[in-house]
């Protein structure tokens, strides 16, 4: 045997030994050799690899640290979004979650009377670590990529850094792992590791961290992986993303498989059945919280069976099959030193408490939110008071109550300034209006608002920061500090001014040179052709988030239609209630906002919207005359009465013109309902408004003659469809809306009268029942083909 062959054999032996010791130490918590012996074996391997560099491989335990610092983190697009979890703060929240799960699985669970308690769901339970969510991608058992969660859709490539975490296997153990396996989990720092890190920083005069979570996040995002390697980071897996191959069919089974492959999981993982067992687990972990080696802020419950998870699906930003049950926030006493007022993007002037610094759950708190002046009044708060401070969710400090017995004699009342603390404009008090069922009522609350609009630098800065953000116009490199410079120097007085910035103006900014100037101007130029959805979100319409912006763009197709849509028309969009509809309508009706939009769309310097088109077919098909009458909120006219009126008269004009005798001939329409309807349409303003709404609905492609004719004219009229399993191209709710737009009735269970079942991956008893009854079954491709045939947009 040659020297090289002998070295190769010894290197392979050392790597196997070290990997085994790492697995026993970090995963099984059963160290088999002293640390000194581990270090000796590690140094021997390093020496051999230095002497025989041709035998060095990337998965060697010595290769956790990269040699050259990175200049920046690359972007990683998550194939399957890394969604956040919904939260439970009270026991009732947990019970409501369990009820929703059981309702969603009604036809899959045994036990008869479901909500009577006959069936209980199995849940996996584990502590919610207070760290940073990351994704580890393994291909053929080798770690090939690490990424942060980011915004859920896009994260940062931190491969070099996660390789330095000692309990992250560079190569999976055992066998049976999928060819491609994305492991998701939390990078965190133990309490002991955090204390040691800070102690070392104090000794060397370095920076200390406020808490383990900040330390973990800061360590993981170092461009130099050598720094990350010097920090005591750990990883704990809690789930999976993309997979090419097979995994066990339960959450607990998958995590136990991870453990067998060398991937660390929580030692507190448990499998329980029912909501009470979840509560018992929560109480047990809560009692032992301070004794755990790491910080946690709650526990996580997940439906155990993967098929059930698929059946339940997702909401817009969170799964329906999992919830984080947060612990009560930590509270401390401190003194209110003063109150300052800050101005937000919409001009709202809100109070911020300035506190005598106090440690709350490991963080020094000197400021706290007071939300608004109604909250100040509710608390009876005065400057000089001793107050109870809570970090809600262990993150956001709040003033919870006043300790009245400690109030000093010179405590001062808190008053809203008459003029904006930033621009000096008047501060106006606006009474809040509550809208419900077409009626307005004055709310007890009020909002104080600076009237300066974009002439107020605080509002201008926040408006531009929102406008350029990743989910809006996505102008890379235009951070908060640069926005502040642009506004402070008078270079930008509205978002439209970004598109007229010159090279000379940007070059003069602090921190800019030739390359950075060109990069920023290029990024601004690249943002000139946004999608309609991005542009709507970028405008900063109150209560319009990213999902609502997408819905508006997808349904109405153009900025012109959105801008002139009446609030009653907007409520035909799913999940757009009266409050949001009026916010949208009022925003576009405002002359100042119209001017800003006109400047942004200036033909020479402004943006050119992409993806403008027609009204979506499913939106045009979603209106009915009965539904329209119901939305008018006429007293004593409920949905049943509206259907009878639509069937009897067939048109809005016919209903408006109906006299008392005509109305009394409507079968089983109560006399008081008939009188209420006649009184309503005797008011000219009501007639004018109803006709205006109908005219706009017709302009947007909606038509009706009678409820029966509207349905009979649709291709799937009279058919009952059922959706089951997971759909990839769209959510089941969207598919349901599209089918209903074609005239189908979408039911929750299969019967002999069912026309067709659409079955995606994970379909269970509904698919089996369809096959048993001989009901037609389509897969997702078949459903999409059907939509294409009938001109329904995907």
Curated annotation (Swiss-Prot):
GO terms for biological process: DNA repair; DNA replication. Its EC number is 6.5.1.2. Its cofactor is Mg(2+); Mn(2+). InterPro entries: BRCT_dom, BRCT_dom_sf, DisA/LigA_HHH, DNA_ligase, DNA_ligase_AS, DNA_ligase_CS, DNAligase_adenylation, DNAligase_N. It catalyses: NAD(+) + (deoxyribonucleotide)n-3'-hydroxyl + 5'-phospho-(deoxyribonucleotide)m = (deoxyribonucleotide)n+m + AMP + beta-nicotinamide D-nucleotide. Gene3D superfamilies: 5' to 3' exonuclease, C-terminal subdomain (1.10.150.20), 6.20.10.30, BRCT domain (3.40.50.10190), DNA ligase/mRNA capping enzyme (3.30.470.30), Helix hairpin bin (1.10.287.610), Nucleic acid-binding proteins (2.40.50.140). PROSITE patterns: BRCT (PS50172), DNA_LIGASE_N1 (PS01055), DNA_LIGASE_N2 (PS01056). Residues 711-794 form the BRCT domain. NAD(+) binds at residues 35-39, 84-85, 126, 149, 186, 302, 326. Keywords: DNA damage, DNA repair, DNA replication, Ligase, Magnesium, Manganese, Metal-binding, NAD, Zinc. NCBIfam families: dnlj (TIGR00575), PRK07956.1 (NF005932). This is DNA ligase. It comes from Pseudomonas aeruginosa (strain UCBPP-PA14). The lineage of its organism: Bacteria, Pseudomonadati, Pseudomonadota, Gammaproteobacteria, Pseudomonadales. The gene is ligA.
